[in-house]
């Protein structure tokens, strides 16, 4: 259910991420931080849950099976809340349309990878349904007066799946591994934190000292998944990292070393992944929670419809066709929920590759596309975009001119720039077997033909698209990408997509590479005062819009089909955190 969700989105994004210069002073406890954060809102929410809200805490396609870790006994739950493993004795089954390319917590970035990681591993903090950061493996934290040193208290009742206790040394090791491997989201903290400045003060206290003020630091920690140091080193192979070998990379390709609610049970990269409940999870378990979770890669809509109607799936992916959702609405034992999000569907335009390196060409593309048909016919229920940031963010710039369908203007822009009909040929890439994206590509091709631009459609697997993104030359001219906050802060939208340091990923397929954009992002990150930071964000959005850096097609209202007896789903405004299966139950 989504009653009042639009207002909640707006309320909780009211002022963007917070470092909170006033509240983070003089002892600055986590509780004071959260009180202020709750007013200003680190990120937004569209709540959708048929059962209780979650506790604690974009898209198709080498090879090996994986085994999971063994659970050993430990305390039942956190603060006496849990029942230590009350079991529904059942399996939760879901489909995804994109393979799990990696399950190494130092490497994962996309939605399926994060879905797997947040269920096998824990972070220090967790984004709740309102986008606020709440304690997770860290039971509490404080921030120094100069906003540079963050001190975390690690829970004393948490254990890894190996049975080893979670300690401050594991957190320190995780950061070292994260930076040394230097993949995944390591760039988020590049220049902000040096691994040498993470110190295990004692068994349950870890201290991070930043190189500079970094307002979204706490929010980025939802992507730092803590690994079992002993398990990783015990299973390390020879490698480039001295006495740490390969840092357990080969092992963690097919195994887990986490403390999360589920252990890896089996893994077939191309087709499926399954998890088994860690009975001794420190939070305990809701009544009628699932013993096992199975996620199958199924891209064919007729197959999904059949499996749901036969009670062989409990939940669909968010990427099914409109026809599938309409059919499921009329299927006995199935409900379909439409969930407002803060995810934008972008047509990412390669700003560095001719002919789309020409701003005039990008402007023509932007005004030559039929956004209303895209929203109303291809993605019904979606909301109008206005610039790179979803309007539900409180720091959204409502003065941006959002292009509308105006083929006459598009043709005139091209003529003024010296282009004649037939001069321009571009490539458009989208995720193959994704019905919505295929229809969007066909609409784009048709629209561009009307303004004299020839579009070659090249559907690809998601894995291939992510590989193409690593090179400006190989990245196609236009690319379909869903992108929403991967951590609860507006910074995630700007840095990951537009900063030059974050280049050559699927998130940054526009290859903006603009010094002024870089400077504005860095200034916002270093600004503690939320009002001053909001002004920077407004200017940043305006510049990206003026550059026609990419096409902002719509804000997603995603849909899922559910079995009627499944509850506990809660949307959280950080990538894949609504797939935290700990809270899912059989009602």
What are these regions (language model features)?
Residues 278-327, 454:
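Ligand-site clamp/hinge motif
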Residues 1-28:
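N-terminal secretory signal peptides
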Residues 269, 288, 300, 415-485, ...:
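Ligand/substrate-recognition segments at binding pockets and active sites
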Residues 139-184, 207, 355:
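Aromatic- and charge-enriched surface segment that lines or borders ligand/interaction sites
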Residues 217-221, 258, 416-433, 477-482, ...:
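Bilobed periplasmic-binding protein-like "clamshell/Venus-flytrap" ligand-binding domains
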Residues 356-446, 450, 513-519, 539, ...:
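Append "and occasionally in soluble cytosolic enzymes with long acidic Gly/Pro-rich linkers
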Residues 11, 18, 113-145, 224-259, ...:
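Short, solvent-exposed loop/beta-turn-alpha elements that line the ligand-binding surface or hinge
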Residues 190-240:
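Surface-exposed binding/hinge segments that line
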